[in-house]
Structure formats: structure tokens, C-alpha cells
Amino acid sequence: MANKFNESSTSSKPVSPVVSFMPPKPVVLVGLMGSGKTSIGKRLARRFDLPFCDSDQEVEEAAGCSIGDIDSVFGEGALQEGELKVISRLINQGIQVIATGCLSFTYEETRRYIKEHAISVWLKGDLETLLLRVTGKKDRPLLEIGKEEEILTKMIEDYYPLLEESDITVTTLDEPASITVDRVIIAISEFIRKTYPDYHILRSV
């Protein structure tokens, strides 16, 4: 992808940036469970002074049941359709920060819509980091307690090639969330400069 931005492409040491720009499109966070989409998304929205939405929460409210129940009762196709409807609606509401479900970006239609209408940021965690955050948690419908490593290993193998299609990749580490947010802001700023050269940004990074 010509305009793909990976934070590793810059050698500058992350420092706490003063946000003096607005993204030209909604910012959509993608990644597997445990990557920090919700926690980072909320902090990122505060730094940008933008609304924050969790698409999983919106899907559950629209359906009147949990993501796990939608999948088990109505099937994966119904879940994909519901996620596409909700995510497209959120994107069309205007510029905001959106945290998506762990597999949302792996669905072709949803991925295509996000890529056309938003800035996608992949919070990429390695297996060790993801396991540290999700092992033993009961609120992860796609994970079976005791088999987290096996399931996550397979998901990384299957889904990371699709997540690579995101506009921006930021590696999530075992570090304070505020530092990760700083790195996301810097990555978004650099991506905008590269991809939207006519878009005016007051640089304070």
C-alpha cells in the first residue's frame, strides 16, 4: 500500500505531543482483543477533543443482546452485517474516534468501507502482550479460558495479513496507555502529512 504508515519508519523518540490538528476523517481503531482499542480510543478522543464510540457496544445496544449471543444464535453473517451497518453509521456521523470489534476489519465489506471513509489505525500486539491482557478474562466471547494462547496464535496467523491493510500500524507494548496514545498521535500526524499534503495542520509535535 503506497501510503501505508508504520511508526517504525520514523526514528524520532516518542514525546508527548501537543495536539493542534484535527484528523480529516474519523479515526477507526482496529486490532485483536487485548490490543487496547477501547482504552486507547477513549484517551485518544480526549486528546483530540472528539467523541468516542465503541462499535461493539453500539451493536449490542442495537441488537438487544451480546456480541456472543448474536454470533451463536443468528450466525457470523448476521454479526458481520450488523457491524457493517453500525460502523458505517458511526463513520457517517462525523469526525470521531471509533473502537471496533476484534474481527470487524477482517470482514471484507467492513474493511473496504473503513478504508474508503476513515483513517484506520491498527494497534498491533504481539502474542505475549495480548496474552498478558486477556488470559483468564471472562468477557472475551471468542476466547476459551485455558486455551487463550492456542486461539490467539491462530488468530494472529489468520488475521494479521488482513489487518496489515490498515492505514497506520502502531505496536502496542506493555507500557502506560498515555505513552501509547502519544505514539498513535504522532503516527496519525505523520500519516496525514504524507497522505493529505494539502490538508493544513499546525504542527506541535
Locate the predicted segments by residue:
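NTP-dependent small-molecule kinase module
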Residues: A2-M22, R43, R47, Q93, ...
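Hydrophobic anchor at the beta1->P-loop junction of P-loop NTPases
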Residues: L29
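ATP-binding Walker
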Residues: S35
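Post-Walker A helix-loop "phosphate-sensing" segment adjacent to the P-loop in P-loop NTPases
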Residues: R46-S55
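A glycine- and Lys/Arg-enriched "phosphate-lid" helix/loop adjacent to the NTP-binding pocket
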Residues: E116-P161
